Each structure stands twice: as structure tokens, then as C-alpha cells.
Curated annotation (Swiss-Prot):
Gene: dut
Entry's EC annotation: 3.6.1.23
Chemical reaction(s) catalysed: dUTP + H2O = dUMP + diphosphate + H(+)
InterPro entries: dUTPase, dUTPase-like, dUTPase-like_sf, dUTPase_trimeric
Recorded GO MF terms: dUTP diphosphatase activity; magnesium ion binding
Biological role stated in the UniProt entry: This enzyme is involved in nucleotide metabolism: it produces dUMP, the immediate precursor of thymidine nucleotides and it decreases the intracellular concentration of dUTP so that uracil cannot be incorporated into DNA.
Cofactors that this protein relies on: Mg(2+)
GO BP, sorted A to Z: dUMP biosynthetic process; dUTP catabolic process
Protein name: Deoxyuridine 5'-triphosphate nucleotidohydrolase
Pfam assignment, any one: dUTPase
Source organism of the structure: Rickettsia bellii (strain OSU 85-389)
Lineage: Bacteria, Pseudomonadati, Pseudomonadota, Alphaproteobacteria, Rickettsiales
Binding site for substrate: 68-70, 81, 85-87, 95
């Protein structure tokens, strides 16, 4: 297995430890909150949460910011723009846009694990305009066209 090294910069507000994989087969690394004061996300509201890190991804890599399943299932806290995308040329602080879909206010404390980051390769494409597209069994069916039940 090839391990790609990615530069990470700890910013002045950094707290805790760098993101790391929890198990040998984890796809994502937990991101932690680096807010100076507790941030309350009221029910139905959105807050931008700092992480205290900036990264330099290699060309043709991206980082996706995804919800943590436990926060979502137990508290209704999820990533509003899931998945959020960090492009390879972005050098600013990684921040997480959290939304509270629950019924109760939720407080984000410094050091709390708030989201996960998955880093992956991607391909760039170029468009080739065409008047026709190859036929498939699915065709233009979408938005529930295959039904709800198996």
C-alpha cells in the first residue's frame, strides 16, 4: 500500500491532536473543534466551526468533510454541505459547516470531534459535446424511478 504524505499546518487556534485514522481500515479521520469559546448551535441553525488546521493536498487530491454518524444519529448534528469539498489549491483553515437538525440546542466544545475528513484522488475531465448519448437500460429514469421496495 502506498501512503501519500500531506503537509498539515497547525494554526494558532489548534487544539488537541492532528486528525488520524481510528482503525486500520478507517476511510476517514476525525476533525476536532478548535473554537476558543463554546459554540451553541440552536435547533435549526447553522454554525461554522474552526478546526485549527490547514492542509496542502497534492494535485488531483481532494478532502471531503463528512458527518460523524454518532453526532447525526444521537443529536441531529450533521455537515450542512455534506460532503464539503476541500480543493487541492486551498490553503486556508479547514472549517466545518454544521447544522442542528435536532430539537435541542447543541454545544460544540473545544476539542470535540465534529466531522470526519476523507482524502481521495480524483480525475479531471474535459467535455465532448454530443447530440446523442449511448442508450442504457435505465435511460433517463431517476428520482425514485426504480421504486422504494426491493
Amino acid at each position: 500500500m502506498t501512503i501519500t504524505q500531506v503537509k498539515v499546518k497547525k494554526l494558532d487556534n489548534f487544539f488537541g491532536k492532528l486528525p488520524e485514522y481510528a482503525t486500520d481500515h478507517s476511510a476517514g479521520m476525525d476533525l476536532t473543534a478548535a473554537n476558543e469559546q463554546p459554540i451553541t448551535i440552536k435547533a435549526g441553525e447553522i454554525q461554522l466551526i474552526p478546526t485549527g488546521i490547514a492542509i496542502a493536498l497534492p494535485e488531483l487530491f481532494e478532502a471531503q468533510i463528512r458527518p460523524r454518524s454518532g453526532l447525526a444519529a444521537k443529536n441531529g448534528i450533521t455537515v450542512a454541505n455534506s460532503p464539503g469539498t476541500i480543493d487541492a489549491d486551498y490553503r486556508g483553515e479547514i472549517k466545518v459547516i454544521l447544522i442542528n437538525l435536532g430539537k435541542d440546542d447543541f454545544v460544540i466544545e473545544k476539542g470535540m470531534r465534529i466531522a470526519q475528513m476523507v482524502i481521495s484522488k480524483y480525475e479531471r475531465i474535459s467535455w465532448k459535446e454530443s447530440e446523442t448519448l449511448e442508450e442504457t437500460a435505465r435511460g433517463s429514469g431517476g428520482f425514485g424511478s426504480t421504486g422504494v421496495y426491493l
